[in-house]
């Protein structure tokens, strides 16, 4: 089971999340049949959305949009405060690796553009924040969002490691660290040093206790306490009934065309690839 550990330094000056999102990203890859570069980019965006969702409470939903001008096209992920996330990438068929190391390349295919974060708290108007993509690697872009839009100094690392022989997801996860208002400059410098000198995310994720390893490396000599473990999962909230309401909202004329030309309708959810079929009778019931 995927999970996130939330923690805070004992002096209350920093908080950090560590995530194992392996099954989440693996399911996304299987559902969308993504190629390696697309898998890593989508996976990082899903993890970023889970990080943001973990910051929220209640029924708030977070949408993360990576809107670059590269070959990848838009990457969209939607998460809630309960650890659920869904998402998709427009171009699923990108497979580019460094010849020397086999490292999957992401940023060149995301390109230049924007990271958009939308918070829907069930009020009339969702909150929306937007920053320029500074690297296209997604983790650094999310850290820039926290600093620019929420004035919170942060460090974010997200990654997806693929099996060399099959390009399936081997492991996926990441971390987020935030400095809270009482953090001193000296403490921030110490934490920055810890993060710069820590092993790669891939190395930590393949350790025996990946989430503890990440948190130990982040805090270094600073004492911290765990605030709890919480489950994470790929989960889409689509349903046949919800899409039926969407068809109904189209109005009489388009529905009559579906009945006359196709004798029914088929809808595929772009977030999870679930397929829903509607009979002629079900469509007629919408307009009678």
From Swiss-Prot:
Segments forming a coiled coil: none
Any one biological process term the GO annotation gives: protein refolding
GO CC term (a single one): cytoplasm
Entry keyword set: Chaperone, Cytoplasm, Disulfide bond, Redox-active center, Zinc
GO function terms (MF aspect): protein folding chaperone; unfolded protein binding
Protein modification: Under oxidizing conditions two disulfide bonds are formed involving the reactive cysteines. Under reducing conditions zinc is bound to the reactive cysteines and the protein is inactive.
Classification via InterPro entries: Heat_shock_Hsp33, Heat_shock_Hsp33_C, Heat_shock_Hsp33_N
Domain of life of the organism encoding this protein: Bacteria
Cystine crosslinks: 236-238, 269-272
Location of this chain's protein in the cell: Cytoplasm
Function: Redox regulated molecular chaperone. Protects both thermally unfolding and oxidatively damaged proteins from irreversible aggregation. Plays an important role in the bacterial defense system toward oxidative stress.
Family according to the record: Belongs to the HSP33 family.
Protein name as annotated: 33 kDa chaperonin
Organism from which the protein derives: Lactococcus lactis subsp. cremoris (strain SK11)
Lineage: Bacteria, Bacillati, Bacillota, Bacilli, Lactobacillales
């Amino acid at each position: 089971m995927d999970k996130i550990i939330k923690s805070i330094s004992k002096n209350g000056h920093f908080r950090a999340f560590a995530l194992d999102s392996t099954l989440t990203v693996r399911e996304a890859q299987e559902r969308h049949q993504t190629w390696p570069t697309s898998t890593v980019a989508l996976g990082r965006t899903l993890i970023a959305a889970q990080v943001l969702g973990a910051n929220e409470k209640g029924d708030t939903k977070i949408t993360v949009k990576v809107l670059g001008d590269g070959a990848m096209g838009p990457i969209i992920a939607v998460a809630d405060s309960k650890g659920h996330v869904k998402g998709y990438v427009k171009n699923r068929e990108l497979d580019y690796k460094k010849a020397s190391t086999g490292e999957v390349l992401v940023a060149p295919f995301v390109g230049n553009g924007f990271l958009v974060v939308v918070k829907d708290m069930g009020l009339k108007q969702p909150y929306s924040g937007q920053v320029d993509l500074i690297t296209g690697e997604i983790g650094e872009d999310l850290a820039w969002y926290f600093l620019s839009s929420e004035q919170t100094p942060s460090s974010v690392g997200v990654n997806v490691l693929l099996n060399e022989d099959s390009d399936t997801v081997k492991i996926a996860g990441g971390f987020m660290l935030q400095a809270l208002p009482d953090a001193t400059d000296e403490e921030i410098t110490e934490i920055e040093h810890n993060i710069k000198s820590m092993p790669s995310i891939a190395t930590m994720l393949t350790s025996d206790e990946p989430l503890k390893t990440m948190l130990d490396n982040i805090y270094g000599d600073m004492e911290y306490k765990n605030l709890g473990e919480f489950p994470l999962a790929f989960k889409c909230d689509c349903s046949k009934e919800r899409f039926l309401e969407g068809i109904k909202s189209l109005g009489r004329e388009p529905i009559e065309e579906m009945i006359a030309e196709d004798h029914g309708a088929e809808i595929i959810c772009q977030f999870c690839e679930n397929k829903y079929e509607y009979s002629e009778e079900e469509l007629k019931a919408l307009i009678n």
